[in-house]
From Swiss-Prot:
Protein name (database record): Alyteserin-1a
UniProt organism field: Alytes obstetricans (Common midwife toad)
UniProt key word Disulfide bond: no
Top-level taxon in the UniProt lineage: Eukaryota
Protein's cellular compartments: Secreted; Target cell membrane
Homology family: Belongs to the frog skin active peptide (FSAP) family. Alyteserin-1 subfamily.
Lineage: Eukaryota, Metazoa, Chordata, Craniata, Vertebrata
Keywords annotated in UniProt: Amidation, Amphibian defense peptide, Antibiotic, Antimicrobial, Immunity, Innate immunity, Membrane, Secreted, Target cell membrane, Target membrane
Asparagine amide modified-residue sites: 23
Amino acid sequence: GLKDIFKAGLGSLVKGIAAHVAN
């Protein structure tokens, strides 16, 4: 459902930020 899509998008965003900060 929409919640699953939102969670997946949010998780991806967090991973992207974490990767950016790690670099």
